[in-house]
Amino acid sequence: KKSKFWSNDFNVIFIKASDMSVKCDVKETRVHTMAGTAYGELLQDKTFWDDKGNLYVACNTERTDAQSYTEQVGNLLRINKGEFQFDQNYMGHNYSAGKLITSTYMGNNKAVLYIQDPVHTGAAGWGNNYNCWFAILDLATDQRTEVVYNGTHLPYSLGTFAQFAVVRDGKVYFATNPEKEAPGIYIYDIATGNVTKGLSIQEGYSFRRLVPMEREKLPAVL
């Protein structure tokens, strides 16, 4: 049964912050919905800016074979710097499968994606299963590469209402909630592409959100 929440498009309103006036209202019809949750950016990374100031928005669309609202496939849309509409010539993560749960910019024109896809992970189905995995997306070529450690993929994880990737000081930290081993953190070095194993926590516990304990270092403005 099709969910009552589904629509075939969504609107983006551009608002001038200084006086709250509406600049314009834009309808997007290529995808169904932004990849938002109840808490939005307070909990999960759904949008990011690249080094050129372009804004990327994670979006999802109902799969043609969907049996529930959860079963979606994701894309990235882009609003170019200085523009007030989506770039109609750009459709990122242009793949036939993979629901976008979070999207985080890691620099060098690449993004970290946390993706739900039970076929890819071999899980029993959608919903509360170990059906999520990490990939790095090249924003220029749209090449999607799964993150690996010691020659194999990171453990497939349980948890979609969560933030499991954090970028800080040249590294990406990944949290995993595997089915058959202790939850753990893996560390990806952006400069070299090497992945090392960080800490593990006791089985029976699980990660829900990685939160840096200090602000990201930003360049001084002169």
Feature-to-residue mapping (PLM):
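Beta-propeller blade signature
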Residues: K2-S21, T70-F84, N128-T141, I185-T192
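Short, conserved, GDST-rich strand-edge loop motifs in beta-rich repeat architectures
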Residues: K1-S7, V57-V73, L113-Y130, N177-E179
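Long, acidic/polar, low-complexity amphipathic helices and coiled-coil-like
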Residues: K1-L42, W49
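Blade-level signature of beta-propeller repeat domains, shared across WD40, Kelch, NHL, RCC1
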Residues: P178, N194-L222
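Intrinsically disordered, low-complexity segments enriched in Gly and acidic/Ser/Thr residues
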Residues: D87-E181
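Repeated scaffold domains used in trafficking and secretory/extracellular systems
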Residues: T33-T47, N94-N108, P155-A165, E203-E216
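Beta-propeller fold detector
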Residues: S21-H32, K81, Q85-Y95, Q143-T152, ...
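Long non-transmembrane domains of secretory-pathway and surface proteins
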Residues: L43-V57, T61-I79, F84-G92, G98-T102, ...
